[in-house]
C-alpha cells in the first residue's frame, strides 16, 4: 500500500511495461510537450538507459520542457508531472487503490482485482490498523533489536569501519520479519533464509519484462520461482497457525487474519508489505545515519533532544512521539535522499492538467524526485535542513506528496517509527562519524540506495 514509491529504470520501466501491456494507452501525445520516440519499437527507452535512471531522465526532461511532459515507452504515451501545482490537479484524495501495490502484484502474478470502493477502504484500514497494532505490541522487541545493534557497535574499536548498508539491512530484516510474521523469525537462520529469498525476488521482479530475459534463462527463472514459492510457503504456514488462536504478541498478519479477508488476500497483502517494508526501513535508516555523520551540528541537536525528552529513563512509544526534531530529520532524509522519486497512476478517464488533455489509459508518472528538488517549492533544495519542516506550509506540501500526515503510507509510517527508535538507542551512547574522503553516490532503484557500501565509524559518549 505504498502511495508514492520509487522505480529505477530496471524496475519502473518493467512496471510501466506491465501496466501498458494490460491497459493499452493512446498513441496521441495530445499536444503535451516532450520528446519524440528515439526508436519505433522501444520509444525513448534508449534515452532513459543513457540517462542512468528514470529519475535522472525525468529531471532532464522537466528542465527542458516544463512541469507537464511526455515521452514514449515503446509505442505508448507516458506523461510525467513535475511540480506541486500540477500534481495537485491530478491527485485524487478519494483514491483508495495504491498503484505500487497493484503493479507489484501483477509482477508477482497475483490477482490485482480492484474490488469496490468500500472493500478497498476496508483493506486500507486493515493495513493502517495492522501497522499501529504491531508497533504497539512489539515496541519492546524493537528496543531489544536496536540495543543488540548498539552492543555490536560498542564492541568495535573507534578506528573500525562499520558497513552501514549491510548492518541496516540486517536490522530491518529482523525487525520486519518478527513484527510482521512473528516468532518464527527469532531463529537467526530463518531470517537469513528470508533475506536470501527476499533478495532474489526483489532483484528479479520486473527484469525481463522488456526483453523476456527471465523466461529465456531457465536457471534464473527457477531461482526466482523457488524463492517466491519459499516465501509464500512460510507465509501460508504462519497464516494457518495464527487463525483461530490468541497470541500474546500481536503481529501485522493478525490484523489481516482478523479482518474479512480470504487466505490469498492475506498472503498477497503480507507479501507486498514485507517486501516493501524491509527495503524502505533499511534505506531510511541508512540515509538518516549517513546525513547525521555528515552534519555534526544536526546530530548534536538531535542528541540534545533525545537526552532532554528521554533522559536516563526507558524509551517508550509515547516519548518517541515527542521527538519533534527527530521527525523533522527523518522527513528531511526522505526529501533529500529522494527515497521515493517516482510514482505512477493509470489515467482512468480522459483528464486535463493545465491546458493539456491526458488521454484515457495513459500512464501518468508523478516525478516526485523532481518535485523534491524544485527550487520553486523548497528553499535551498539541495541543503539538508530539517528545520525547514518547522513551516506548516512545508509540511502540507510534504503530506500532499504522500510522505506524512493522512496520506502517509503504512510502510513509511512503520519505517519512521523503527528508524526513530534505532536513532534514539544509538545516539544515547554513540557519536556517529563519517569516514574521511568517502563520497557516497546515489543509485535510484525501487528504493533509493548508495551505489557502494557506505562506511562509518563510531565513538562512545560514555
Curated annotation (Swiss-Prot):
InterPro entries: CYP450_20A1-like, Cyt_P450, Cyt_P450_E_grp-I, Cyt_P450_sf. It is an enzyme of class 1 (oxidoreductase). Keywords: Heme, Iron, Membrane, Metal-binding, Monooxygenase, Oxidoreductase, Transmembrane, Transmembrane helix. It comes from the Eukaryota. Its cofactor is heme. Its EC number is 1.14.-.-. Heme binds at residue 409. Pfam families: p450 (PF00067). The keyword Metal-binding applies. It is found in: Membrane. CDD domains: CYP20A1. The chain crosses the membrane at residues 4-24. One of its GO terms (cellular component) is membrane. It is a single-pass membrane protein. One of its GO terms (molecular function) is iron ion binding. The keyword Transmembrane applies. Belongs to the cytochrome P450 family. This is Cytochrome P450 20A1. It comes from Bos taurus (Bovine). The gene is CYP20A1.
Amino acid at each position: 500500500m505504498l502511495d508514492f514509491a520509487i522505480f529505477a529504470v530496471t524496475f519502473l520501466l518493467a512496471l510501466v511495461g506491465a501496466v501498458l501491456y494490460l491497459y493499452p494507452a493512446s498513441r496521441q501525445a495530445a499536444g503535451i510537450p516532450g520528446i519524440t520516440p528515439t526508436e519505433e519499437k522501444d520509444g525513448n527507452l534508449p534515452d532513459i538507459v543513457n540517462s542512468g535512471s528514470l529519475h535522472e531522465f525525468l529531471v532532464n526532461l522537466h528542465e527542458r520542457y516544463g512541469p507537464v511532459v511526455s515521452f514514449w515507452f515503446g509505442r505508448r504515451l507516458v506523461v510525467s508531472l513535475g511540480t506541486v501545482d500540477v500534481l495537485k490537479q491530478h491527485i485524487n484524495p478519494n483514491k483508495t487503490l495504491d498503484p505500487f501495490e497493484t503493479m507489484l502484484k501483477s509482477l508477482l502474478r497475483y490477482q490485482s482485482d480492484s474490488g469496490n470502493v468500500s472493500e478497498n477502504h476496508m483493506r486500507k484500514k486493515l493495513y493502517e490498523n495492522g501497522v499501529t497494532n504491531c508497533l504497539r505490541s512489539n515496541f519492546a522487541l524493537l528496543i531489544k533489536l536496536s540495543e543488540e545493534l548498539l552492543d555490536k557497535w560498542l564492541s568495535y574499536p573507534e578506528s573500525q569501519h562499520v558497513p552501514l548498508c549491510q548492518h541496516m539491512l540486517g536490522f530491518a530484516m529482523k525487525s520486519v520479519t518478527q513484527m510482521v510474521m512473528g516468532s518464527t523469525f527469532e531463529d537467526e537462520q530463518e531470517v537469513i533464509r528470508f533475506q536470501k529469498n527476499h533478495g532474489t525476488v526483489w532483484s528479479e521482479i520486473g527484469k525481463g519484462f522488456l526483453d523476456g530475459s527471465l523466461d529465456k534463462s531457465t536457471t534464473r527463472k527457477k531461482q526466482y520461482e523457488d524463492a517466491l514459492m519459499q516465501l509464500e510457503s512460510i507465509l501460508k504456514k504462519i497464516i494457518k497457525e495464527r487463525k483461530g488462536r490468541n497470541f500474546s504478541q500481536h503481529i501485522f498478519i493478525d490484523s489481516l487474519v482478523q479482518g474479512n479477508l480470504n487466505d490469498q488476500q492475506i498472503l498477497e497483502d503480507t507479501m507486498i508489505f514485507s517486501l516493501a517494508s524491509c527495503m524502505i526501513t533499511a534505506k531510511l535508516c541508512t540515509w538518516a545515519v549517513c546525513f547525521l555523520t555528515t552534519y555534526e551540528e544536526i546530530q548534536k541537536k538531535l542528541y540534545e533532544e533525545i537526552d532532554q525528552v528521554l533522559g536516563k529513563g526507558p524509551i517508550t512509544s509515547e516519548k518517541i512521539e515527542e521527538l519533534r526534531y527527530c521527525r523533522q530529520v527523518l522527513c528531511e532524509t526522505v526529501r533529500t535522499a529522494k527515497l521515493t522519486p517516482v510514482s505512477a497512476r493509470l489515467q482512468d478517464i480522459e483528464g486535463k492538467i493545465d491546458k493539456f488533455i491526458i488521454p484515457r489509459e495513459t500512464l501518468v508518472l508523478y516525478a516526485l524526485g523532481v518535485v523534491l528538488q524544485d527550487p520553486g517549492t523548497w528553499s535551498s533544495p539541495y541543503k539538508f535542513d530539517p528545520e525547514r519542516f518547522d513551516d506548516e506550509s512545508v509540511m502540507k506540501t510534504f503530506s500532499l506528496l504522500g510522505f506524512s500526515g493522512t496520506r502517509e503510507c503504512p510502510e513509511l509510517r512503520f519505517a519512521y517509527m523503527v528508524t526513530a527508535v534505532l536513532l534514539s538507542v544509538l545516539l544515547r551512547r554513540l557519536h556517529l562519524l563519517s569516514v574521511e574522503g568517502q563520497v557516497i553516490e546515489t543509485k535510484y532503484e525501487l528504493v533509493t540506495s548508495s551505489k557502494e557500501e557506505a562506511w562509518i565509524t563510531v565513538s562512545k559518549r560514555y
